[in-house]
Amino acid sequence: MQINISNLDVKNHLDKFIEDRLEYEFCKQDKYLYLENDNLKLHYNNKELFIDFNDSEILNRINPKTKKCSVVQAIEGRSKAKLTILDTTAGLGRDTFTLAARGHTLLTLEKDSYLYLLLKDALQRAQQINYLKEIANRITLINIDSNEYILTTDKSFDCVYVDPMFPPRKKSAKVKQGMQILHQVGFNDEVSNSNLLDNIIQTQISPKAVVKRPINAEFLSNKKPSSQLKGKTNRFDIYSL
């Protein structure tokens, strides 16, 4: 069932700004939101995107018995403190949810309004599940461009996380359908991403920034990090500011 945003109520938490902004856009045939069994989904170019924090992949990531993933290692370092983290690029919300499961408090930004609504719906569903409720409640989600937020907020954070979303390379292996849509819908251009790191440094919003990059990519904004955590296909550039 295709629906207009004016008829959409994601558990009574949609704001009027989003409603007015997207009422027409959600009616496009190649890109629209729809409800299926009370779950909000995105149809885009004959593909479907649905975000669920109760799926097996997420549950495995947040299992205390699972080895800490790279993003957790990069952001926590040797600290055992519970951090306030600004996630500037929410995407599918997996890193955000993983960090919140570690006890950290997240303010998460997503500029794409489709992804924002999918994430909001997913968080609200997680809040209804006993073993996920506490995690979901540590996450605050805002629909805004990251550069705009950083330049206008008076808040500060223990760490800022940046995961620039670039279109996949033509030679890269096929990725999951959800990631394919994310690459097409949620990526920023290189100038915006470079400006983001520059603005983080300029505003002194945090003493630490962590930037996720493809393993062989150049430094964001040509700025050499203080340290790095490398994996097989990507790395985390860590900036002490």
From Swiss-Prot:
Segments traversing the membrane: none
Cell compartments where the protein resides: Cytoplasm
Recorded superkingdom: Bacteria
GO CC terms of this entry: cytoplasm
Coiled coil: none
Gene3D superfamilies per record: Vaccinia Virus protein VP39 (3.40.50.150)
Gene Ontology MF, one: rRNA (guanine-N2-)-methyltransferase activity
Catalytic activity annotation: guanosine(1516) in 16S rRNA + S-adenosyl-L-methionine = N(2)-methylguanosine(1516) in 16S rRNA + S-adenosyl-L-homocysteine + H(+)
Keyword Cytoplasm among UniProt keywords: yes
Pfam families on file: SAM_MT (PF04445)
Main location: cytoplasm
Role, per record: Specifically methylates the guanosine in position 1516 of 16S rRNA.
Name of the protein this chain belongs to: Ribosomal RNA small subunit methyltransferase J
Gene name of the encoded protein: rsmJ
